[in-house]
Amino acid sequence: MFITEIQLKNYRNYEHLELSFEDKVNVIIGENAQGKTNLMEAIYVLAMAKSHRTSNDRELIRWDEDYGNIKGRLQRRNSSISLELNISKKGKKAKLNQLEQQKLSQYIGEMNVVMFAPEDLNLVKGSPQVRRRFLDMELGQIAPVYLYELSQYQKVLTQRNHLLKKMQGNSKNEETMLDVFTLQLIEHGAKILRKRFEFLHLLQEWAAPIHRGISRGLEELEIVYKPSVDVSESMDLSKIKEVYYESFQSVKQREIFRGTTLLGPHRDDLQFFVNSKNVQVFGSQGQQRTTALSLKLAEIELIYSEVKEYPILLLDDVLSELDDYRQSHLLNTIQGKVQTFVTTTSVEGIEHETLKEAKTIHVTNGTVDCEIDRK
């Protein structure tokens, strides 16, 4: 799949922009704070209906405007699809082929993207929240039902936490309601957990050989899910629910005392091991970066295996963060099969066949100038 064009209106620092793209490589060049990352982000938001940079949608709307709008056209193997996302203070509305979608989960997944930005290098050494977000965003693309369960879980979690804070003063009168929320949380949480186990099993199958290749056969990568309750990948849904119920019963008084939910997918984490050593704790910076690169390349192949088309790859100022060897491995892997967008302040020092035929887009203060063929 590839995106052929995009239109922006009141998006970040773009008042109005219409731009067409090559189906292979597009290089976006500009100094910092000129709008190249905003353009890359707009492609991501068009696909995912949320930003990888902020959770505050208001930041996506141009200063002093009431709304922002992104339109694009996606070419898939057997069809051409128009996508539109309107962002306002009231929320987001999405359209596919001019038809408004009732739920964003019906929209997300039509256009698949893999973003690789400098902050993704923190996937290994960053906070658990970074890794959970990685899971949610990537899994949501290939399993819309996961996004539904996640949104329902978040709603119940918010209600349950509000009730727990209220119960800190007087718990007895609200215990029945707490039990209702607990059962709802278990219902959605168990399904989220089951989907995460399945996804990580597939990701492991792709990431391990990729990591082995990048490390020239010297390193074996293992991805380990660390749930907040004592469950395992081998358990079925009913067993996971049973363990959740018993675990919530055991921490009930502690949750009331602390006024917050202590268990569930929102408390889980991922760990990465290279040659049986925890990369977050014992890995070198090079090993941490190789792990992040392996995961991103594995995402590309996993999405292809699920939807039978390669996703769009967004490389946002990340090539300069990789050494020549990892840079070459990345570009060799995607060459000729993945539509790729690259942002950079300069193409000097990046000598690779993949970039030779690229469309070059120069960005200066929210305006663009294009040229094709850097040769």
From Swiss-Prot:
The keyword Transferase does not apply. One of its GO terms (cellular component) is cytoplasm. InterPro entries: DNA-binding_RecF, DNA-binding_RecF_CS, P-loop_NTPase, RecF/RecN/SMC_N, RecF_2. GO terms for molecular function: ATP binding; single-stranded DNA binding. Keywords: ATP-binding, Cytoplasm, DNA damage, DNA repair, DNA replication, DNA-binding, Nucleotide-binding, SOS response. Belongs to the RecF family. PROSITE patterns: RECF_1 (PS00617), RECF_2 (PS00618). The RecF protein is involved in DNA metabolism; it is required for DNA replication and normal SOS inducibility. RecF binds preferentially to single-stranded, linear DNA. It also seems to bind ATP. It is found in: Cytoplasm. The keyword DNA damage applies. This is DNA replication and repair protein RecF. HAMAP family: RecF. ATP binds at residues 30-37. Pfam families: SMC_N (PF02463). GO terms for biological process: DNA replication; DNA synthesis involved in DNA repair; double-strand break repair; SOS response.
